[in-house]
Amino acid sequence: MKNPANTTYTVQEATQKLEYYCGYQERCHQEVVSKLYELHMIPQAMDIIIVHLIDHNFLNETRFACSFARGKHRIKQWGRIRIVKELKFKKISAYNINLALKEFSEDEYLETFNTLAERQWETSRETNIFKKKKKFGDFMLRKGFESFLVYDKLKELVLQK
């Protein structure tokens, strides 16, 4: 059995490994470069492999950004601010970030926001209204929704009760 720390790969082996890595799930360039460093590849080999992955459509930043934004909004119910921060953290270009934010409509965004806000407000067991408002605001801001949306919804929910 080989020791993973001492394993070396040829360019072809590493390319094959990264084709599988990128085929399994959308990846950004930063994730691929990190994986290449884990495989102890030299910079010249990294360049060859990355060019191969881009040429054969295994690696596409625009596709990654759109898929990331769509999934995080629909599944994890993240707001625009959190999505933008995460994409910037992954070193995605501003152009691709703007394209990614167009993956969901304004109506879908507001519907997700309202559903999440109402569910959070109803499920909170906090009896002190000030603590409840604080927890609600913190939760929604942590999810990445705009502060004006959060505080307008908070006023609306407080008035309903």
Q: Model-derived features: where do they sit?
A:
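An alpha-helical, amphipathic repeat domain used for nucleic-acid recognition
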Residues: 1-161
